Swiss-Prot record:
GO molecular function, one term: cysteine-type endopeptidase activity
Organism: Nostoc sp. (strain PCC 7120 / SAG 25.82 / UTEX 2576)
InterPro entries xref list: Caspase-like_dom_sf, G-protein_beta_WD-40_rep, nSTAND1, P-loop_NTPase, Papain-like_cys_pep_sf, Pept_C14_caspase, WD40/YVTN_repeat-like_dom_sf, WD40_repeat_CS
Ranges: WD repeats: 1070-1109, 1111-1150, 1153-1192, 1195-1236, 1280-1318, 1320-1359, 1361-1400, 1402-1441, 1444-1483, 1486-1525, 1528-1567, 1570-1609, 1611-1650
Gene3D superfamilies: 3.40.50.1460, YVTN repeat-like/Quinoprotein amine dehydrogenase
The entry's keywords: Repeat, WD repeat
Protein name (Swiss-Prot/TrEMBL): Uncharacterized WD repeat-containing protein all2124
GO biological process, one term: proteolysis
Matching Pfam families: nSTAND1, Peptidase_C14, WD40
Keyword Nucleus: no
Length: 1683
């Protein structure tokens, strides 16, 4: 902290004399010049700290004049400085002022005169009269000042070898005399007679001044927040006395331990120090007041409380008390809900916090030991070894308090205390206790009582806690083991809270008291509220009955009220006598209820196999076994009783019910049965007579809704249990948003859990609810959808599979949860690793629950601290709550889409189980229609069937074939008497029919396999193979009769997908080693390639190899066509350049001259010269006719890799291994400039056709664009993942192609924005070039191939990148300008032809919608700041801001005449504005949720609006009256637009559909389905024949008006928010959250590619050259497309 040394000028002193001032003279001396005065450690810092505390606290003095003198201040504490300061002050003070003199240092009595002197830095002990500051002098100066209050604070009784100890009688008398003379005198002395001032290193101050500072900082305030001088004295006196007393208490305990070990080196205790005051006439002087500080919470200590036995309320209360009064940041970890890894990580994390003064660890568990060692067990599966814990303690640098609460008794706790001891000056306290079995919470309660007693008093030190615990446990059977070390500082568990202000924020123990989608368990009873009345009803019924049915709707909380309400009450034994001794077990029936029952009952000692055998003996055996149990009464809870009717086989269900109901009847005194049952399953239960009778006797209905008071308890009381606060406003909003429906309770629990995750400083806030969750309605939907959409595509597919598998399809009832074995999810399509990865995400999101109980039972109780293996078949999986099935629309849609198939598939699975249980008897095989269904499933869904089901279907098919063969043989025998010719004819027909059907089934399987192969090849970038496989499938579909519609659709979709994604046009194969270079003749008809195989090959444009040039003795690195195409130049590793005649391959000449490899050759534009670049650091210029060397260009300091001529031939550019590009003048070889910027070799160069730009490719993974005129770097293109080996401009200069060692080619526009990546090469790509006057790119690779590429059939013409996320796009009326807007709040205007940015209209917050006026002069924006803005297009000036909406504005639209502007908002309204003056016209009210979209009809008479309330509303634009409301979709409606003639409306929705409506009567014409996610918007083409839709699935789809899908544009990398046609209908623009806007060419004829024959024709056109010329194409493939 900076030193304070402030003196105020005399002129300032004289001003405002009527205002009381505070004059401070503060002196502190550490270092003395006199060797006979020992130096001190803390006096200077005492002075500094007290000065700052006084300056800050004394706010009632508007003027404070501070004079500070200490070792670190600008002015030293010399006699001259201090004396001058005192005299100067007395000459300027007013009577109403206050003077405070403070001194910290040595005080000495002159032995001759008995005068008291304060020793300053230059005081000489031998000459006190002349060098010391006499106290008498100070008092005289203060007395003459005449001020109202004179304060003298002295800390001058320090130890350190001085002969004087304590305050002498002379000093006291002198101060008393001065007090008597003064009307207002107050002296504070650091100690009394015969005492001395103590300094403690851990305080960093003398103890007296330390508490002066603390008191002024707020701890000495009274109830009004004021600091009185007397109050400050009492605070300092008490705290000083207490601190020394606690220190001595700790030292006594440590010395006691030392004596016990025979150690004689004991610590001395500190004599008492009691500050003294001398006062006269001051009265109640207010010295300061508490300052309100908004500093973030800083905790003194860190605490972890681990509850490892049961969820004891006592340990939770300990955590709350530590957190609320002990300045602790406390984390409470119940072992039942925390993994071993998390507990160990938390302990390790807390030990490594250097800022903590104290770290406290409370572990409640049981000590266990075996031959393998000894550990502390927390819960069932968490084990903490002593060695591990000691290692953690050694890493801790703060004070430590470790408490081991280990009930049930153990002899080894003493060993733990002995082993965990660490000698540390910082301090360590170990406490261990073993409560007896009859009172397992005895120690925890005593510890809590000890904390509670000290919480609001003087605090609690570790030594004090030990003493109190020893006293309170003295008469019990609870042994206590302790250890205490540390001599520097008191280990304070609780600090003094007497003077602390109340905590205003909530606690954050890290415990979520809300269950989310999970049911409450018994361990959660402390947080279970709202069902107290129902719980009492259950207790009442169970008291007098042996059977109890708890019935309620799905989501009503049946399981929770039994587990967290009833069972904990029974275990307490307060309501039913002796119920605490009952044995209680809970099961779910599942698919094998008898086995589940046997496993659970086996926990009482018998093996589950023995019990299962006993159960099969019937009721008599079960009753006998129940009566033999020692616990008296056995309670069996069957949760989700309806599983007996949905999952269990009928024979098992009947036996199970017979056993349990028989036990109720014949052993009712020893057995009680409790079931939870969904209300919609009462009917099947009533069909069982005994069960129906029981239900009528004892059933309790759990109401689906709670009262508002109960809902309030559900919100508030769990939070109070863990110290959380809930804002009152939040509670009221939550209660208001409840719909009073069945699903309210689980949705509320889910929202509360989400709020807990968003908590702030231990508080649940309304702000978090509104900003993060957006309301109860839709919170679950948003959360589920968010988790699903965060998954990569492969995991999304697996998640869909999992959720469908975990849903039990309702048969006249609602769909329900379905619990299955995890192993059942693993099939060929979804292997174990994929399922495991997906389940991890879903379980972490708490959407799915994995149950390990069955597995643990199967393995037996293990003491291994490692977690159970999740891969065993005993692990079950289920959806967290059935509310998820009802409220997640995506899952609902999946279910509706797959319901029939799933039902059939599960029927087949059930038939398979029966077949296996029968020993695979043929009688259980499927036949007829059921077999046909199974066959369809087998053909199309093979990879989703388990191996056992596939075996079953295979056996069914084999049996059918066997029966067909038998039928055929019987037919032959019956026809033997018939004429031979007739017999042969009939047999022929029979054979033909059988063969036909068998062949047809095989063809279907082959088509499906080809489709799968195509998709797999696409994923692995084998595009040609993918298209060929898909073409084969399509050809087969065209030649097979009655292909199932779903197979035909899959084939069309696969072929369409392959065509849309095709990039590779042809593959030229013939080289035997990597291809390094290619060159293309100017007419584009010939391609030359140079290879590591030492050859040059010439290829025709269609891929035919027509000549190989041999002559080089080593690798050919470069080939180049002359401008006229008559000559080819080549260079390579043999250091030569060769010139060849193109027409016949004749070698014209060999040019030598380079001393190392020739890396590149290139002809001048006029063809007269050839430039060569070499590893010998040079570029050489040659005459092409004679081969003579014309010039050598030097300057590069390393090998030259590339050389190029500018288009005008006047400049030569070269790139080198020295990381530079150099430019030379061709005529004289003069070096023009050097371009620096690359970080690695420059591998390739290319001039733009206009010669103004140079592109360079480098091994630093970048391409750079340079302006030739001045050599300035224009742009760096980044995207490749490895060295870039080649770069070239297209002939029109609009595109750039680059080739890289990362196996890819990238296409960029001239602005450096990436347009496309071509992937398929299996080796690094060394060369790339454009075929002249075409959109085909050739590439050469180390994979020995040359490949020809063409951009996909549907690909963007241009990509605009400017906004951070594009929400809206719009065309100017003439199509010349495109406007984009988005998350960054800016509107950007672009030229539609070349994509250049014209201007940016800056904004603040996100813009969700934009609209041009029909005249094109204005543009309006819908803004997140609740406003609408209108801009002038020509200059970008903001003209008006329209204010009126109460929430974000989503959409704006101008009327056709441009006079009215409509805006749609999140405030549920549409507003109309006058454009000319910006005045508000009217509000259209009616929607019940936010309005996303608004549009005018073409005649301007009707306004259409789309809303989150799932409706479209039509309004009269003049009156604002509602014309019609259309219940349009099953989810949020995002947009609605009129077609050009106003006769139709198109709407889009979160239900993933586009719908077409007749506008005059609202009749639904078509529903367009195909998007896989939310559809945000749509637009009509200008001729009204097509609709474009934009979706979160990253695609734009184009539809015919009859609902036929024309094409899909799949290029975006994130959701597409907007897609609109240009006014001329020839282009389409799409704006996406991937930050880009893409401009697409739209040709309606080319786009019409979803008809099979058209697709086949397109595929054949694409493949023609490849099939005709590639040597590796098979003969059958060559016949795929006959001419």
């Amino acid at each position: 902290m900076p030193p304070i040394g402030l003196s105020t000028s005399r002129t300032t002193h004289t001003k405002q004399t009527n205002v009381p001032k505070l004059w401070l003279v503060m002196v502190g001396v550490n270092q003395y010049q006199d060797e006979y005065l020992p130096n001190l450690n803390y006096s200077a810092i005492d002075c500094q700290g007290l000065s700052e505390a006084l300056t800050e606290a004394a706010t009632q003095f508007t003027q404070k004049i501070v004079n500070v003198y200490h070792d670190f201040a600008p002015q030293p504490p010399s006699l001259t400085n201090v004396r001058h300061s005192l005299r100067d002050i007395t000459s300027h003070v007013s009577p109403i002022d206050t003077i405070l003199f403070y001194f910290s240092g040595h005080g000495v009595v002159d032995p001759t005169t008995q005068e008291v002197f304060l020793c300053l830095v230059d005081t000489q002990k031998s000459n006190l009269q002349n060098t010391g500051l006499a106290l008498q002098e100070i008092l005289q100066i203060l007395g003459k000042s005449g001020v109202q209050n004179q304060l003298v604070w002295l800390d001058a009784c320090h130890s350190g070898g001085m002969s004087l100890r304590g305050v002498t009688l002379q000093l006291v008398e002198l101060l008393q005399q001065s007090a008597a003379k003064s009307k207002g005198f107050y002296a504070l002395l650091s100690c009394d007679n015969n005492q001395q001032s103590w300094e403690f290193p851990e305080l960093g101050h003398g103890v007296f001044t330390y508490y002066l500072i603390r008191g002024l900082q707020g701890e000495a305030v009274d109830s009004q927040g004021l600091i009185y001088l007397d109050g400050l004295y009492r605070y300092v006196y008490h705290q000083t006395l207490q601190y020394i007393d606690k220190t001595n208490q700790q030292l006594r305990l440590i010395n006691q331990q030392k004596r016990g070990k025979g150690d004689t080196q004991l610590y001395n205790e500190y004599p008492l120090q009691t500050p003294k005051r001398i006062v006269e006439g001051v009265g109640e002087l207010i010295l300061g007041k508490r300052l309100e500080k908004n500093a973030p919470g800083v905790y003194r200590g860190l605490g972890i409380v681990v509850e490892g036995l049961s969820n004891s309320k006592i340990t939770l209360d300990i955590s709350k008390l530590l957190g609320s009064t002990g300045d602790f940041a406390v984390e409470y970890l119940p072992a039942t809900k925390t993994s071993s890894e998390d507990i160990k990580a938390a302990i390790a994390r807390h030990w490594q916090q250097p800022q903590a003064e104290l770290t406290l660890l409370y572990l409640r568990g049981r000590i266990e030991e075996s031959e393998a060692g000894e550990w502390l067990r927390l819960g069932e599966d968490i084990c903490i070894k002593r060695s591990w814990l000691k290692q953690q303690l050694r890493q801790c640098t703060s004070q430590q308090v470790i408490i081991l609460d280990c009930p049930l008794g153990t002899a080894s706790l003493g060993d733990w205390i002995e082993d965990l001891q660490i000698e540390s000056h910082h301090g360590q306290c170990l406490i261990a206790c073993a409560s007896p079995p009859e009172a397992p919470e005895n120690f925890a309660q005593k510890f809590l009582d000890t904390l509670t007693a000290s919480a609001q008093g003087d605090g609690l030190s570790a030594a004090g806690a030990i003493a109190q615990l020893q006293l309170s446990l003295a008469d019990s059977k609870t042994p206590l083991y302790v250890w205490l070390s540390g001599t520097q500082g008191i280990i304070e568990i609780l600090t003094n809270n007497t003077h602390k202000s109340q905590r205003t924020s909530g606690l954050d123990l890290g415990v979520c008291p809300y269950m989310g989608l999970n049911a409450f368990a018994e361990a959660d009873a402390a947080y279970f509220y709202g069902r107290e009345t129902v719980t009492q009803q259950l207790i009442h019924h169970l008291r007098d009955n042996s059977f109890l049915a708890v019935i309620g709707a799905s989501g009503s909380g049946k399981s929770s009220v039994v587990q967290a309400g009833l069972i904990p009450q029974l275990r307490q034994g307060k309501h039913i006598p002796n119920s605490e001794q009952w044995g209680i077990k809970t099961i779910r029936p599942g698919v094998n209820p008898l086995e589940a029952l046997a496993r659970k009952l086996g926990e009482w000692g018998e093996t589950h196999l023995l019990i299962e055998g006993m159960l099969h003996q019937g009721v008599e055996g079960f009753v006998y076994w129940l009566r033999s149990l020692p616990q008296g009464v056995t309670v069996l809870v069957i949760d989700q009783f309806e599983e007996l009717f949905t999952l269990a086989p009928t024979p098992d269900r009947e036996l199970f019910l017979e056993l349990l109901l028989g036990a109720v009847q014949y052993a009712g005194d020893r057995f009680k049965l409790i079931i939870t049952l969904r209300a919609d399953f009462i009917a099947p239960c009533l069909e069982v007579p005994a069960l129906a009778e029981a239900l009528q006797v004892a059933s309790v209905l759990v109401p689906p809704k709670l009262s508002l008071d109960d809902y309030r308890r559900v919100i508030l009381h769990p939070a109070q249990q863990v110290g959380l606060q809930v804002e009152a406003e939040l509670v009221e909003v939550l209660l208001r948003e409840l719909n009073q429906s069945v699903g309210d309770l689980p949705l509320l629990e889910f929202v509360l859990e989400q709020l807990w995750q968003q908590r702030t400083a231990g508080k649940l806030t309304l702000q978090s609810y509104q900003e993060q969750l957006g309301g109860i309605k839709g919170a679950l939907e948003r959360s589920c959808q968010g988790v699903y959409e965060s998954l990569p595509p492969q995991l999304q597919e697996c998640a869909k599979w999992i959720f469908l598998s975990l849903t039990q399809l309702g048969e006249g009832t609602e769909d329900t949860r379905r619990r299955i074995y995890k192993s059942d999810l693993i099939v060929k399509k979804y292997p174990a690793g994929l399922v495991e990865q997906t389940l991890n995400v879903l379980t972490n999101a708490k959407l799915v629950v994995i149950n390990l109980e069955a597995e643990i039972e199967a393995q037996g109780k293990s003491f291994s601290p490692t977690p159970p293996n999740l891969s065993t078949p005993f692990v079950t999986v289920e959806v967290a709550h059935e509310i998820l099935i009802r409220h997640w629309s995506t899952l609902r849609w999946w279910l509706e889409e797959n319901r029939d198939r799933l039902r059939k598939q599960r029927q087949i699975n059930h038939a398979c189980q029966l077949w296996q249980q029968s020993g695979k008897q043929a009688d259980f095989l499927l036949q007829g229609a059921r077999l046909a269904e199974a066959e369809d499933i087998y053909i199309y869904w093979t990879d989703e069937l388990g191996a056992d089901v596939q075996e079953f279907i295979g056996a069914c098919l084999a049996e059918r074939k066997h029966q067909q063969l038998q039928a055929k043989n019987r037919l032959k025998q019956a026809q033997r008497a018939v004429v031979a010719l007739s017999v042969l004819g009939i047999a022929s027909v029979s054979f033909g029919g059988l063969a036909y059907w068998q062949g047809r089934e095989a063809q279907f399987r082959e088509i499906a396999a080809l489709n799968s192969s195509s998709q797999a090849n696409l994923l692995s970038h084998q595009q040609l193979a993918a298209l060929i496989a898909s073409l084969k499938a399509a050809q087969q579909v065209n030649h097979v009769i009655a292909v199932p519609n779903n197979l035909k659709l899959a084939t069309v979709t696969t072929l369409q997908q392959a065509l849309f994604e095709m990039q590779e046009r042809n593959r030229l194969e013939g080289h035997k080693d990597g291809v390094i270079s290619i060159s293309i003749s100017r007419d584009g008809q010939t391609i030359a390639s140079g290879s590591l195989d030492k050859t040059i090959k010439l290829w025709s444009r269609d891929g035919r190899l027509f000549r190989t040039l041999n002559g080089h003795e080593d690798a050919v690195y470069s080939v180049s066509f002359s401008p006229d195409g008559q000559t080819i130049a080549s260079g390579g590793s043999d250091k030569t350049i060769k010139l060849w005649q193109t027409s016949d391959g004749t070698l014209l000449k060999t040019i030598t001259g380079h001393e190392q490899t020739v890396n590149n050759v290139y002809f001048s534009p006029d063809g007269k010269n050839l430039a060569s670049a070499s590893s010998d650091h040079s570029i050489k210029l040659w005459d092409t006719t004679s081969g003579q060397l014309l010039m050598t260009l030097t300057g590069h300091s390393a090998g030259v890799i590339t050389v190029r001529f500018s288009p005008d031939g006047q400049t030569i550019a070269a790139g080198s291994e020295d990381k530079t590009v150099k430019l030379w003048h061709r005529q004289d070889g003069k070096l023009l400039k050097t371009l620096n910027g690359h970080q690695d070799w420059v591998n390739s160069l290319s001039f733009s056709p206009d010669g103004k730009t140079l592109a360079s490719a480098s091994a630093d993974k970048t391409i750079k664009l340079w302006r030739i005129a001045d050599g300035k770097l224009v742009k760096t293109l980044k995207g490749h993942n490895d060295s870039v080996w080649d770069v070239n401009f297209s002939s029109d200069g609009k595109a750039i192609a680059s080739a890289s060692r990362d196996n890819t080619i990238k296409l960029w526009n001239r602005h450096g924005i990436e347009l496309e990546t071509f992937t398929g090469h299996s080796g690094g790509v060394y060369a790339v070039n454009f075929l002249p006057d075409s959109n085909i790119i050739a590439s050469a690779s180390l994979d020995n191939t040359i490949r020809l590429w063409q951009r996909p059939l549907i690909s963007p013409l241009e990509v605009l990148a400017g906004n951070s996320g594009v929400y809206a796009v719009s065309f100017l009326h003439d199509g010349s300008i495109i406007a984009t807007a988005g998350a960054d709040g800016n509107i950007q205007l672009w030229h539609s032809q070349d994509g250049s940015l014209l201007k940016t209209l800056p904004g603040n917050k996100a813009i969700y919608g934009i609209s041009f006026t029909p005249q094109g002069d204005l543009i309006a924006s819908a803004n997140a700041d609740k406003t609408v803005k209108i801009w002038r297009v020509r200059d970008g000036k903001a003209l008006k801001t329209l204010i009126g909406h109460d929430n974000e504005v989503n959409k704006v639209n101008f009327s056709p005449d441009g006079k009215t502007l409509a805006s749609a908002s999140r405030d549920n309204t549409v507003k109309l504005w006058n454009v000319s003056d910006g005045k508000f016209k009217k509000t259209l009210k009616g929607h019940t949720d936010e309005v996303f979209w608004v549009s005018f009809s073409p005649d301007g008479k009707i306004i259409a609006s789309a809303s989150a309330d799932k409706t479209i509303r039509l309004w009269d634009s003049f009156s604002g009256n509602l014309i019609k409301s259309l219940p349009a979709h099953n989810d949020l409606v995002y947009s609605v637009n009129f077609n050009p003639d106003g006769s139709m409306l198109a709407s889009t929705s979160a239900d993933k559909t586009v719908k077409l409506w007749r506008s005059h009567d609202g009749h639904l014409l078509h529903t367009f389905s195909g998007h896989s996610n939310v559809v945000y918007s749509s637009s009509f083409s200008p001729d009204g024949r097509y609709i474009a839709s934009a979706s979160e699935d990253k695609t734009v789809k184009i539809w015919q008006i009859d609902g036929h899908l024309l094409t899909t544009l799949p290029q975006h990398q994130a959701g597409v928010m907007s897609a609109i046609f240009s006014p001329d209908g020839k282009t389409l623009i799409s704006g996406s959250l991937d930050t880009t806007t893409k401009i697409w060419r739209f040709d309606s004829q080319q786009a019409k590619t979803s008809q099979m024959n058209t697709l086949v024709m397109s595929a054949c056109n694409w493949l023609q050259d490849y099939l005709n010329t590639n040597p590796n194409v098979t003969p059958n493939e060559q016949k795929l497309c006959p001419s």
